[in-house]
Amino acid sequence: MTTATAIVAGHGLALRRSLHLSKPSCATFSARALPPAAHCCRTVVAAAAPSSRTCRCRSVSSESSTAAAADTADDEEEVTKSDSEEEEMDPLAEVCYLDPEADAEGIREWELDFCSRPILDARGKKVWELVVCDATLSLQFTRFFPNTSINSVTLRDALASVATSLGVPLPDRARFFRSQMQTIISRACNELGVKAVPSRRCVSLLLWLEERYETVYSRHPGFQSGTKPLLTLDNPFPTSLPENLFGDKWAFVQLPFSAVREEVESLERRYAFGAGLDLDLLGFELDENTLIPGVAVESSRAKPLAAWMNGLEICSMEVDTGRANLILSAGVSTRYVYAGYQKSAATTQEAEAWEAAKKACGGLHFLAIQENLNSDGCVGFWLLLDLPPPPV
């Protein structure tokens, strides 16, 4: 059994794992042993207490109280006010909102969904809706449509009206998470000069849809309880990893929540490859010392590997303990066998502990790419989040 230490992202955190590295059937990483580190004791990724995280996805109804809370000390009163306003939200109203303090020119990426809702119109037909926002929810737009006008022309015109109505430029990129809508969305975006990006990294949008289900759709007079989503998310069987995405070695690792925050904040400053999440917007209530589970990958081609990974729209990682594989999910419906390990009672226990730790952290985890697992820096860092499929 080999024992190794991975020091991630310049924080000097030594994390030891004990795994027999092996080639899975769709080989990803070599079976070379990691160098031992005698100065550290072994640390198994342990499950923490369940996270108290609540996703506070900013809504239009809470914007005024959020702004006021910044100028007053009575936060609890403002939150109560926000909650009561949300309860009185008109389920028939459409949203057209831009945060007055937002840099309109700086909103270069949108997240959008164009799909049916569990609502019937006067004809007894499904109502469709366009929902658009940015990652910070500074921009929010919704519009309902009859099912007779669902095409790329309708979507193109609606997206153009978002820009004109709010006085913002069209974005450079628009993310969407439903693979079934790729043709319509791509065509509409292309005609506007916007790059359509299939991606499940639409975290703000997904959380806003959850909120709208509770505050809008379920209160609509045409709401159909128990209706399943028309377009469900794909979850295909994982395939072999492309040759250019192979690494040399990998390790289960952990970082304190405070260090994860630092790494995300430093991404833009260092122009590193990777992607973060707005942890404040998501409302993570974790202790700064809570250990966040992750995967560290060593590669002699770390920079090219990180660059290639940067184009994948990585959204999550999970362990398939039955097949002793690590699965990488990217885009909207892509799943790769990213790594494998020799299956045993010990490795299965460690993999299960890693998954349990992830669940205890509200689904938060990360992927780090390094030139050396014993180095004190990383070339690429992706903060990832497990999210359930949207209710619509």
Curated annotation (Swiss-Prot):
Residues 1-45 form a transit peptide. Its main location: plastid. One of its GO terms (cellular component) is chloroplast. Residues 66-90 are annotated as: Disordered. Residues 72-90 have a biased composition (Acidic residues). Keywords: Chloroplast, Plastid, Transit peptide. Signal peptide: none annotated. It is found in: Plastid, Chloroplast. It comes from the Eukaryota. GO terms for molecular function: RNA binding. Nuclear genome-encoded factor involved in the biogenesis of photosystem I (PSI). Required for the accumulation of PSI during plant development. Does not seem to be required for the translation of mRNAs of the PSI subunits. PANTHER family: PROTEIN TAB2 HOMOLOG, CHLOROPLASTIC (PTHR34556:SF2), PTHR34556. This is Protein TAB2 homolog, chloroplastic. It comes from Oryza sativa subsp. japonica.
